[in-house]
């Protein structure tokens, strides 16, 4: 693909040049080619995006629920019509296999938008009787202008997960995509405008997180920040949001999730789940179950089943429909993952497979890392304690139920957890003791629009998707009505 035209900001229904004068490049990680130069938003750009959003939000909030619903449904239709086109761009920008982006990224994002478009007319208040002459009623009102800050692993899906409930509730959103993968968020802005969204209701500001993101979190005109990213960055976002104007926050942060295989489990099912929980999207999924706990007596058999499945991984041309494994999103991220792999070897974990870059035709110029499985791991190892965010599975053994629950919970993270067992009594007993916000029994990874997702502990605050997320983009106003004569003590 030839290099794209320089990408601008999207403010008030159209493209506009950044006032900062700064740019950055977005790279195709499959081959190292530059896809485009992208303009970076500065402080003045954030100011004008906020002013634009304030204007647009008033128009948007004044529309009826059905009018807003119809516009968002039109955007859903356009997304589905352009699924393949958007998926190709997402593959170029992220490196993910087209077999994945064409069936997951836009599809699941559009599903969430459709879900919230349908919920808009159901946003309602309540009536609370006090006595015969007085009652209270409540209204759910939009927050105003909110900010979304996205991560690089699911660019358009995250943009939709954040914008759908925000817009459905009558807010305007300023979205800052990751500087690593900024392209499809700009296309989403075009689609919203085409669907009839008033100018300013969805503005997109590409830029460097440490600058553009900080300007957004500190801006007094922003009422809420929804952030997806790492724990360290999330703490900064939260601190800036609180220090500036006590903004509300939603934080979807990292994870080091446990997948527990019990001794009654079908090991073929368990191995299939472990593979999806570690190597889907080349391991770049925040909910991945990278700590795989297996009964000691099942270890050897489980290792063989994992090795057999690793042989089925197909890395290569990301547009080949048979390819199911792509490069990592960037060269700096690849190098970071390789440092973790080296640390695992240094600390005594045994490499069952992988453990290096992929080499040969089609791999040498890209950010490729081989699917890697470590065994003989211990809880104190760096690869077991820290989020790697790459194709690295750690196998650990255990002897008892109480032991594995304790070890599974021995982490600062609490995003996801899963178990594989044929015993549903055991399944529910254990799941109820695991300290994680998203749990799966005999499956892994699905996060449908109806399901609230978010973490415990350092893995986040608040939830995305589900009814409660729509409500989190509103504020409740309580109004008391008195029909009798008011009595004053003065």
UniProtKB/Swiss-Prot annotation:
<feature type="binding site">
    <location>
        <position position="460"/>
    </location>
    <ligand>
        <name>K(+) 2</name>
    </ligand>
</feature>
<keyword id="KW-0558">Oxidation</keyword>
<keyword id="KW-0520">NAD</keyword>
<feature type="active site" description="Charge relay system">
    <location>
        <position position="464"/>
    </location>
</feature>
<feature type="active site" description="Nucleophile">
    <location>
        <position position="286"/>
    </location>
</feature>
<keyword id="KW-0560">Oxidoreductase</keyword>
<dbReference type="GO" id="GO:0019285">
    <property type="term" value="P:glycine betaine biosynthetic process from choline"/>
</dbReference>
<dbReference type="GO" id="GO:0008802">
    <property type="term" value="F:betaine-aldehyde dehydrogenase (NAD+) activity"/>
</dbReference>
<dbReference type="InterPro" id="IPR016160">
    <property type="entry name" value="Ald_DH_CS_CYS"/>
</dbReference>
<keyword id="KW-0521">NADP</keyword>
<feature type="binding site">
    <location>
        <position position="180"/>
    </location>
    <ligand>
        <name>K(+) 1</name>
    </ligand>
</feature>
<dbReference type="InterPro" id="IPR029510">
    <property type="entry name" value="Ald_DH_CS_GLU"/>
</dbReference>
<feature type="binding site">
    <location>
        <position position="387"/>
    </location>
    <ligand>
        <name>NAD(+)</name>
    </ligand>
</feature>
<comment type="function">
    <text>Involved in the biosynthesis of the osmoprotectant glycine betaine. Catalyzes the irreversible oxidation of betaine aldehyde to the corresponding acid.</text>
</comment>
<feature type="binding site">
    <location>
        <begin position="176"/>
        <end position="179"/>
    </location>
    <ligand>
        <name>NAD(+)</name>
    </ligand>
</feature>
<feature type="binding site">
    <location>
        <position position="27"/>
    </location>
    <ligand>
        <name>K(+) 1</name>
    </ligand>
</feature>
<dbReference type="InterPro" id="IPR016163">
    <property type="entry name" value="Ald_DH_C"/>
</dbReference>
<feature type="site" description="Seems to be a necessary countercharge to the potassium cations">
    <location>
        <position position="248"/>
    </location>
</feature>
<dbReference type="InterPro" id="IPR011264">
    <property type="entry name" value="BADH"/>
</dbReference>
<feature type="binding site">
    <location>
        <position position="457"/>
    </location>
    <ligand>
        <name>K(+) 2</name>
    </ligand>
</feature>
<feature type="active site" description="Charge relay system">
    <location>
        <position position="162"/>
    </location>
</feature>
<feature type="binding site" description="covalent">
    <location>
        <position position="286"/>
    </location>
    <ligand>
        <name>NAD(+)</name>
    </ligand>
</feature>
<feature type="binding site">
    <location>
        <begin position="230"/>
        <end position="233"/>
    </location>
    <ligand>
        <name>NAD(+)</name>
    </ligand>
</feature>
<feature type="binding site">
    <location>
        <position position="254"/>
    </location>
    <ligand>
        <name>NAD(+)</name>
    </ligand>
</feature>
<comment type="subunit">
    <text>Dimer of dimers.</text>
</comment>
<feature type="binding site">
    <location>
        <position position="26"/>
    </location>
    <ligand>
        <name>K(+) 1</name>
    </ligand>
</feature>
<feature type="binding site">
    <location>
        <position position="93"/>
    </location>
    <ligand>
        <name>K(+) 1</name>
    </ligand>
</feature>
<comment type="similarity">
    <text>Belongs to the aldehyde dehydrogenase family.</text>
</comment>
<dbReference type="InterPro" id="IPR016161">
    <property type="entry name" value="Ald_DH/histidinol_DH"/>
</dbReference>
<feature type="modified residue" description="Cysteine sulfenic acid (-SOH)">
    <location>
        <position position="286"/>
    </location>
</feature>
<dbReference type="InterPro" id="IPR016162">
    <property type="entry name" value="Ald_DH_N"/>
</dbReference>
<feature type="binding site">
    <location>
        <begin position="150"/>
        <end position="152"/>
    </location>
    <ligand>
        <name>NAD(+)</name>
    </ligand>
</feature>
<keyword id="KW-0479">Metal-binding</keyword>
<dbReference type="InterPro" id="IPR015590">
    <property type="entry name" value="Aldehyde_DH_dom"/>
</dbReference>
<protein>
    <recommendedName>
        <fullName>Betaine aldehyde dehydrogenase</fullName>
        <ecNumber>1.2.1.8</ecNumber>
    </recommendedName>
</protein>
<keyword id="KW-0630">Potassium</keyword>
<feature type="active site" description="Proton acceptor">
    <location>
        <position position="252"/>
    </location>
</feature>
<dbReference type="Pfam" id="PF00171">
    <property type="entry name" value="Aldedh"/>
</dbReference>
<dbReference type="GO" id="GO:0046872">
    <property type="term" value="F:metal ion binding"/>
</dbReference>
<feature type="binding site">
    <location>
        <position position="246"/>
    </location>
    <ligand>
        <name>K(+) 2</name>
    </ligand>
</feature>
<comment type="pathway">
    <text>Amine and polyamine biosynthesis; betaine biosynthesis via choline pathway; betaine from betaine aldehyde: step 1/1.</text>
</comment>
